[in-house]
Amino acid sequence: MTKIEIKKIVEDLIDTFLEAGKISLELRSKGLKKEIKSDNTPVSNGDLEVNKIITNKIKKITPKIPIISEETPDNKSDNDLKNFWLIDPIDGTYDYINNLEEFTINAGLIIDRKPVAGLIYAPAKKRMF
């Protein structure tokens, strides 16, 4: 994968991250449904909805690259992947569910076991990295 191809992929994801951030804030303003996962950490319907938005877009633009996501437990079985996406749809769920600003939406692209690109969006602060 060339640098130009990687740049295009990241550019294609920016609007999706902005949309996911908007939806995360809308869901939070309406009141989140919260649960505790088997690892004793919180998860909300916001986490799951953002995960769905991000993974659906990534599957469309890079269908041959597997996705490993915190909120999709059945996709962590292959420990020998060279190329994959690593996603944390809401990093900082505790802050997210408690109406604090310190949470982000994250995705990183790993090629040949090396990080080559990533996006981090802080919706409450409207900051993209």
Where is each model-derived feature located?
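N-terminal subdomain of lithium-sensitive/metallo-dependent phosphomonoesterases centered on the IMPase/IPPase/PAP
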Residues: 1-90
